[in-house]
Amino acid sequence: MAPQGQSSSSRGGRSWLIVLVATVGSLLISLVAGTHVIFAVITIPLVISIAWSSPELLITIMPVWMVFLGFVRRFTPGGGNVTFSGDPVLIIGPVALIVLMLVTVNTRGAPPLSKLARVVLGFNIVAILEVANPKQGGLMAGVGGLLFVFVPTLAFWIGRRFGSVDVLWRVAWNVAILSLVAALYGLYQQFVQFPSWDLTWIESKGYTALNLGSGIVRAFSTFSSAQEYAVFLSVGLIVWSVLAAKSVRMPLPLHLAAMTVVALALFYESQRTSIFLSALALGVVMAARLRMRPITVAIFGVSAVVVLVVFAGAIGGGGGSAALQGPDSTAAVLANHQLSGITDPTGSGSSLPGHIKATRVGMFSAFKNPFGHGSGSTNLAASRYSTTSKTAGTEFDPGNMGIAFGIFGLIIYFLMLWRMTAMGYRLAIVRRDPLGLLVLGVIMATLLQWTNGNLYSVCWLLWFVVGAGDGLLSRQDAEVDLTLPSVETAPAFTWRKPGEPRRVARI
């Protein structure tokens, strides 16, 4: 409760100012000192303090930090090392989630366990047990793997407890604005130049996935990878679309302009998977808004993808950007790469067949190794800490679950896939407002990427949004059960003895 004469909004603004000053100050100190250790030493106690005093504020801030994590790592000199991450700033996000989880456990107000919550709990238990799997190449690989597989899912439980309607909308607006900022920075990288700190990172990491040939390098904006950038733009595009249906929003011309910038950045980033998932999510959200049946919603989503392929074929057939700007321009190379992959997703120049094959191999490996290879076998922990494991992650969740958790992982994941999509659809139908569409849209935009902890800014966000949606739905169901009117039962029938007068029932 706010003190007398001081509104909650003013306290929230003051808290934001304190966090901003402390973060910028520690960033400048680390810049001068040439090490990330100082930044982490200053920031982590601040994160813990905010988590205990105002968890909702920290949840609202989390998207900002996760989006700018890659930028901070590149802009400031590195230095230092820690056992689990190699860069101390990487543990700030996991620390925030762990402390928020402790706050969640120590406070009341979480709704009763739903069917989805029970499945997620089973997933968490399996992830912890798989830490001890010897096939991943050591205990350190398993513990490190928890940072990518287990810790992001803590946001589900945090969302169930603290994901109120107000908090969820604040997070949504932050994600929308951040996607616009990231899109503008990514377009600057793509069509103007890469700043010196980004060029240094490209050269030092030798990131071959960024190179499209003809001297064209993919943009990655403020993120740690081009894939993370693309997935976040996809989520941002869905959020902007849902916010357009909200009563309180930006003026429509500005709103549409923001959506256009994000969509252009997503297109020119040239990641086909995110384009397909964006079309799928938009189709599903549109059908859910019309309150169609589940099968019709699925058909709408698939139809949106088909329309995308047909439209891309029409543009590509006409020469696309090459006709306007020349075949060697940056825009033409990016557009032709994108359009060729969309119109012929299984062609020789597409990476989709390879991803599907790797996913299929990963799923079938669950039958050869029923207990999997461990929590750290499909993420960065394997390359950093594993001593014997040679397994690698696939592009999609089913393959990763088959490799990491074996047959149990596959069963739990497909149960989770069913329960999560069902919850998102039911929330959208029951609430009849943009908030339900938001949860369903984010689920679809990140489909088959839910356990990819390498997507720092996206993975935890998906789990928080899903947890918040599940919590809202569970509370609504509980309120309905409490408010159902009691039905009076008719008196039990008894036989009348011979000669006994009739009894008049009193109502």
Where would I find each of the regions flagged by the language model?
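A membrane-periplasm/extracellular boundary helix in multi-pass inner-membrane enzymes
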Residues: L184, Q189-F194, M286-T346, F364-S365, ...
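Alpha-helical transmembrane segments of multi-pass inner-membrane proteins
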Residues: N124-A132, A172-T200, N211-I216, F220-S270, ...
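N-terminal hydrophobic segments of proteins, predominantly signal-anchor/transmembrane helices
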Residues: S49-F150, M444-T446
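Transmembrane alpha-helices of multi-pass inner-membrane enzymes
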Residues: I238, L282, P294, I299-F300, ...
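Interfacial loop-to-transmembrane-helix boundary motif in multi-pass membrane proteins
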Residues: L58-I59, V64, A110-F123, I158-F194
